[in-house]
Amino acid sequence: MEQKICVIGFSGGQDSTTLAVWAKKRFKKVCLVGFDYAQKHSVELECAQKIASLLQLPYEIIPLDFLENITRSALFKNSNDLIGHSHAQNKDLPNSFVPNRNAIFITLLHSYAQKLGASNIALGVSQADFSGYPDCKEDFIKSIEHALNLGSNTAIKILTPLMFLNKAQEFQMAKDLGVLDLVIKETHTCYQGERKILHAYGYGCDKCPACQLRKKGFEEFQANKK
């Protein structure tokens, strides 16, 4: 397999955008792949498309809108659940969790990597600031990498350079990569789809768990600069 192709799971958020720039500096070819899983706000996909264009990287969207028919999450556009509560199917998880979402995403990215002859997949997951999602943890990523390679007789690596970075460290990484302004102004994190108010850390409602996590990280990043 060609060693210089990397397929990235891309949402247009802080994590995957920082990851895309990191990968662009390391691989000859980088391909961004997003997923339309009937998420609550189309702004996420719109931001991803714009960022891909700014970075001059190819971007594919895979439709997965059937997901809301087979499972439950407050992130689905037809959900009446208010974000910030426990998940209806598992009280130990937040209701923004989409069961098996990352497993499905990674499986499709693995198939796409095989089609391209790529030996690397990169994900912007982190267990330092993982919002309570078990499918962002290193043990899960290593397990699914092993299972998918066994099932396809391949040796595709799943790279997770942000795995042990918190949001403050990710802001520092974006600065070191020269894209801090891009990350602040163009990426989307807010669960409410708010793009009208630009805060110091980026656009958002300033209230949802995603905004609070990003805000806290930016404040820590700023404090560490002093």
Swiss-Prot record:
Question: What SUPFAM superfamilies does the record tag this protein with?
Answer: Adenine nucleotide alpha hydrolases-like
Report residues binding Zn(2+): C190, C205, C208, C211
Swiss-Prot/TrEMBL keywords:
ATP-binding, Ligase, Metal-binding, Nucleotide-binding, Queuosine biosynthesis, Zinc
Q: Which Pfam families match?
A: QueC
Where does the sequence pass through the membrane?
none
Q: Which reaction does it catalyse?
A: 7-carboxy-7-deazaguanine + NH4(+) + ATP = 7-cyano-7-deazaguanine + ADP + phosphate + H2O + H(+)
Q: Name one GO biological process term.
A: queuosine biosynthetic process
Query: Cofactor binding mode, per the note?
Result: Binds 1 zinc ion per subunit.
Cofactor(s) annotated in UniProt: Zn(2+)
Q: In which pathway does it act?
A: Purine metabolism; 7-cyano-7-deazaguanine biosynthesis
UniProt-annotated binding residues for ATP: F10, S11, G12, G13, Q14, D15, S16, T17, T18, L19, A20
UniProt cross-references to Gene3D superfamilies, sorted A to Z: HUPs (3.40.50.620)
Entry's HAMAP family?
QueC
Q: Function, please?
A: Catalyzes the ATP-dependent conversion of 7-carboxy-7-deazaguanine (CDG) to 7-cyano-7-deazaguanine (preQ(0)).
Q: Which NCBIfam families match?
A: 7-cyano-7-deazaguanine synthase QueC
Could you identify this protein by its name? 7-cyano-7-deazaguanine synthase
The organism encoding this protein is: Helicobacter pylori (strain ATCC 700392 / 26695)
Phylogenetic classification of the source organism: Bacteria, Pseudomonadati, Campylobacterota, Epsilonproteobacteria, Campylobacterales
Q: Which gene encodes it?
A: queC
